[in-house]
Amino acid sequence: MEFTPQSLAQRIIDLGLADSSQIDQVWAELRRANIDLETFKSSLLRKGVVTNFQLDRLLTGERLGFFYGPYKVLYMIGAGTFARVYRAVHRETGRVVAVKVLRRRHRDDPRQVEQFLREGKMGLQLRHPNIVSIYDIVNDSRTPYLVMEFVEGETLREILKIRKQFDPISALKIMADVCSGLDHASRLGITHRDLKLSNVLVSASGRCKLVDFGLAAMADTSTPEALADCPSARAIDYAALERGTGVRKDDVRSDLYFAGSILYHILAGTSPLTETRDRLARLNVSRFREVKPLGTIIPNLPQSVLSVVSKAMEIDPTRRYQTPAEMLGEIQMTLRKLEAAESTSTKTADPAATPETTPPEEDFLEGNGFSVMLVESKMDLQDLVREKLKSRGYRVLVFSDPARALERFSPEEPAPAHCLILSAPELGNLALDAFNRMLELPHLRDLPAILLVDRK
């Protein structure tokens, strides 16, 4: 469908994405009748009338998928095998949530719908700081969906792409959060069954939260034929491990094995398991027997850290950690030892320092306690700026889309960062428009912002 500025404005009003007064403000800003569609679109985005996600759908002629019940979709934040996840806002209260919607190809299968809703109900029981909460389950006849806690941050997979590896203390802190969430669930008789980097969310404050508890159970792994057609790679991994080691489905020790594989991955920067798209090859138990010892990849890792990884990833489940609480306890003990050793080495590095009056070196970094959001499209520059800021104590959130970065700032919630850096050399007018738009939004007007431009 071909839109004019006038017809696009009317479609926005008709669908309830904005009211006429908001559209009138756009017309007033433009101050002329004969404007082209591109200019009108830019003004809509700059004034926050619609998001990029909404605009893209509008321009393709879509009329559905903008609302789920009282929640208006702002943009898509994730897509998996069985569902898509959107950031959304309640039309009346302004509450920001995540809405998980069962994908269309699964909605016609009553068993899949029933399983999706059942797993949602299971998630309602889980209330823990290290688990993403489910607030509501909506059994809509056309589009069933879950209303969930929205976590301001990134997945562990996204962060690892930037950081490449984690130091032992940081990695163990992540795994302590993971095991704490698993422990809470296991006490209620619930296992995760889909532990992987993308199902660990890291909030802007650094807290890790598990998402998608039990949703992998939607994958049919009951027969070799079903496994061959199973779309969930991790569900196949769980089935292969359990069949190869003779344990029942839903054994919590399977979760602990894959928790150990996450710890291995973030320490080494590479997966312990041979990656393959061949589903039958994933069923071969030799993948689990041929894991390279972590110490051969990272020779200088403390033995206590290697021991945690090795025990979690024991192929024999009787030699593995038996409960999340057991694994959590050993991680916490190892953390205390590493932090004590680090503190001792810091004190002995400068014999003239007075321990009672001189705080640790990191207390002098000007960035301690502050977060910076960087918007940059080039991966190498993301890494460079991030490491420079990190060396000064700042926590850094990285985005490549200026519009999406601004959407992370909500007037109803604490700001995810204390400063915004927009890099214009690659992003061009997208970065400039976002920078200018900050002056028009009351909740962003006083946020410190830096626009980086090239020397030209």
Annotate each PLM feature.
Residues 103-125:
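AlphaC helix of the eukaryotic protein kinase fold
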Residues 201, 211, 237-342:
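C-terminal lobe helix-coil module of Hanks-type protein kinase domains
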Residues 180-190:
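Protein kinase catalytic-loop region centered on the HRD/HxD motif
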Residues 137:
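Activation-segment/catalytic-loop signature of the eukaryotic protein kinase fold
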Residues 1-105, 113-114:
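Non-catalytic accessory regions
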Residues 110, 205-245, 276:
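Activation segment of protein kinases
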Residues 174-175:
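Activation segment signature within eukaryotic-like protein kinase domains
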